[in-house]
């Protein structure tokens, strides 16, 4: 029964692992719900800033902010939002594949690339893959603050204002639902013109100190809020992916335990049958 003992030991080991993955699944569910609440709370802020920017631009049409001007592409920047931890399925891998594909298109057109990386997994990827990482930040925790991101985002905004990059995009996972997380590359600046629901009605405002100064400040705040929204949404996607990964691991452990239990029962049955045969054979010999 040496084989049966090994099987019993393996079953006990898998049951222990199953308890861990089940606990991690429950923790991920709780964290995902909190991340969804933060995501829902921050989204109206960015949308409202976008509406105000539209009003300000209309109020001062002779002033075109640098963030609204299209330039010939010589160098582009990416803010890459990844996770700090693993065990979240193919979340980061799919994100990096999407990014690498977009980078390849730019390189084919002779466009150089600068990177701002958020998250330990992104930093580790670009250490191996290569790339001009000009700013990096990690370990933002479960409740990231927009103030934690300002320094890294400012590096990219200054590069744009100085003419060192001609476009800035954010690369992150969109939280579609619990089962679906979609890697996306979204252009931040130059600001892409979109039909703005907030401009269905036009009002005349009095701006203090003036519309130009307000627009300058709001444009920077808008980009910061968009990056923050991407970080919060990526965190929700990470927790959803981890929940699914841990559920699959728990289910697979259950299947493996059932298979091993069957093998153990067969081995035990074979051993008992052999012992009975030996006893019967011995009795017949007597």
Curated annotation (Swiss-Prot):
GO terms for molecular function: ATP binding; proton-transporting ATP synthase activity, rotational mechanism. One of its GO terms (cellular component) is proton-transporting ATP synthase complex. The keyword NAD does not apply. Disulfide bonds: none annotated. The keyword Chloroplast does not apply. InterPro entries: ATP_synth_F1_ATPase_gsu, ATP_synth_F1_gsu, ATP_synth_F1_gsu_CS. One of its GO terms (biological process) is proton motive force-driven plasma membrane ATP synthesis. F-type ATPases have 2 components, CF(1) - the catalytic core - and CF(0) - the membrane proton channel. CF(1) has five subunits: alpha(3), beta(3), gamma(1), delta(1), epsilon(1). CF(0) has three main subunits: a, b and c. Produces ATP from ADP in the presence of a proton gradient across the membrane. The gamma chain is believed to be important in regulating ATPase activity and the flow of protons through the CF(0) complex. Belongs to the ATPase gamma chain family. This is ATP synthase gamma chain. It comes from Pseudomonas syringae pv. tomato (strain ATCC BAA-871 / DC3000). The lineage of its organism: Bacteria, Pseudomonadati, Pseudomonadota, Gammaproteobacteria, Pseudomonadales.
């Amino acid at each position: 029964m040496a084989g049966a003992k090994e099987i019993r030991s393996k079953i006990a080991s898998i049951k222990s692992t199953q308890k861990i993955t089940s606990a991690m699944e429950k923790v991920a569910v709780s964290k995902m719900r909190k991340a969804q609440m933060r995501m829902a709370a921050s989204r109206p802020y960015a949308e409202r800033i976008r509406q105000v920017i539209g009003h300000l631009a209309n109020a001062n049409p002779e002033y075109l902010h640098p963030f609204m001007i299209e330039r010939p592409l010589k160098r582009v920047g990416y803010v890459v939002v990844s996770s700090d931890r693993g065990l979240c399925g193919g979340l980061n891998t799919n994100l990096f594949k999407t990014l690498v594909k977009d980078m390849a298109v730019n390189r084919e057109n002779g466009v150089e690339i600068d990177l701002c990386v958020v998250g330990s997994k992104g930093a580790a990827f670009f250490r191996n893959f290569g790339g001009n990482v000009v700013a990096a930040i990690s370990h933002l925790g479960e409740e990231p603050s927009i103030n934690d991101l300002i320094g890294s985002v400012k590096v990219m905004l200054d590069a744009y204002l100085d003419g060192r990059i001609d476009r800035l995009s954010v690369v992150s996972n969109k939280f579609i639902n619990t089962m679906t997380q979609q890697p996306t590359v979204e252009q931040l600046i130059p600001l892409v013109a979109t039909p703005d629901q907030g401009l269905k009605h036009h009002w005349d405002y009095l701006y203090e100190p003036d519309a130009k100064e307000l627009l300058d400040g709001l444009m920077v705040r808008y980009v910061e809020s968009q990056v923050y929204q991407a970080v919060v949404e990526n965190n929700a996607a990470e927790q959803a992916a981890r929940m699914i990964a841990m559920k699959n691991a728990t289910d697979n452990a259950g299947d493996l335990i059932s298979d091993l239990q069957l093998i153990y029962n067969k081995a035990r049955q074979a051993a008992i049958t052999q012992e009975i045969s030996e006893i019967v054979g011995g009795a017949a010999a007597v």
